[in-house]
């Protein structure tokens, strides 16, 4: 028995040493991040496998279109080691949750995507240019990212208008910054983004509305296994993803606790209600699409930047404390 206890104690000491080494390694990389212009740091730069530095020197729409079309620039959700180190500092407990990890990687999601809204914006803002492009490219069936890129390069009316839209430019420039990323359970990213379903609902305000509904219904124990499951089922259409999401959310005492832990304070009002990205944006039929693009772009970038500030502040405090 004494020998067994000795072995257990030694294993615990070894684990503590491993955790200490991991923490020190995490601190070094995160400290270097904080020494940069961390509020504007583009995490796709951490996933740039091109042979020169031209991608990192890009900005605005040019960089966004390059990210979407270059094979050698990867998705930060699944490729940024820096983002992973930040997650480990802010949420160290997630490393022990099997429903949050895969092959040693904490699952991540880009909260508010650009492309779906940008494509709709092109259709609404440049109908003549879209029509002309489709006539000249009969094999093109819908407004894709490559079509947006080509139109930006070919039509001066498009490029000058986009470049003059300050809120849209700011939204695009903050797309890959810290405040637009969140750890999520296994399967969350693919299910929410619309593979086999619909990217029309791939908006973080809509996602938070359903998550809040889940927490609201969780208070009513007689409804718990029925209606609250349905709220998550609306977000996802795979049983495993639903179960993982419920495990994730059930790890928090309340909606307010969840909001605080994930730095979503700027996405809710003083009463804890989710603030839509634009007036009328909701899960109701016909209301899931953006009605006012200017309002959407302004609110989206403001919330991303505000959350980045909160996360950066929390990182500094955690590093100082440890």
Label each PLM-derived region with a short phrase.
Residues 164, 169-170, 174, 201:
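Glycine- and acidic-residue-rich phosphate-binding/metal-coordinating active-site segment common to enzymes
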Residues 1-166:
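Intrinsically disordered, low-complexity N-proximal targeting/linker segments that flank membranes
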Residues 120, 146-149, 153, 160, ...:
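Feature representing long, continuous alpha-helical segments
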Residues 51, 66, 89, 123-124, ...:
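Intrinsically disordered, low-complexity regions enriched in small/polar residues
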Residues 33, 41-43, 61, 65, ...:
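Phenylalanine-focused residue identity feature
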């Amino acid at each position: 028995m004494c020998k067994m206890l000795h072995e257990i104690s030694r294993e615990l000491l070894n684990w503590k040493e491993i955790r200490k080494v991991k923490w020190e390694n995490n601190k070094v990389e995160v400290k270097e991040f904080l020494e940069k212009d961390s509020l504007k740091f583009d995490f796709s730069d951490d996933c740039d496998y091109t042979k020169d530095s031209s991608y990192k020197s890009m900005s605005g729409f040019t960089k966004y279109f390059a990210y979407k079309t270059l094979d050698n620039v990867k998705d930060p959700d699944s490729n940024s080691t820096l983002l992973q180190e930040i997650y480990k500092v802010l949420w160290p407990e997630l490393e022990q949750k099997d429903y949050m990890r895969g092959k040693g990687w904490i699952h991540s999601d880009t909260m508010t995507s650009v492309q779906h809204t940008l494509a709709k914006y092109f259709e609404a803002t440049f109908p003549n240019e879209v029509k002309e492009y489709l006539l000249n490219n009969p094999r093109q069936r819908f407004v894709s990212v490559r079509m947006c890129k080509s139109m930006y390069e070919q039509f001066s009316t498009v490029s000058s208008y986009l470049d003059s839209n300050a809120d849209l430019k700011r939204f695009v420039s903050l797309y890959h910054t810290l405040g637009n990323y969140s750890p999520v359970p296994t399967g969350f990213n693919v299910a929410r983004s619309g593979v086999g379903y619909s990217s029309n609902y791939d908006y973080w305000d809509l996602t938070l509305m359903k998550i809040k509904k889940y927490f609201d219904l969780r208070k009513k124990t007689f409804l718990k296994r029925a209606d609250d499951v349905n709220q998550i089922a609306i977000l996802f259409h795979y049983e495993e993803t639903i179960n993982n999401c419920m495990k994730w959310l059930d790890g928090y005492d309340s909606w307010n606790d969840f909001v605080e832990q994930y730095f979503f304070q700027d996405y809710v009002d003083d009463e804890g209600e989710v603030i839509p990205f634009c007036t009328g944006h909701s899960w109701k039929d016909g209301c899931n699409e953006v009605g006012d693009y200017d309002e959407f772009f302004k609110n989206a970038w403001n919330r991303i930047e505000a959350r980045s500030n909160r996360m950066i502040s929390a990182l500094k405090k955690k590093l100082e404390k440890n």
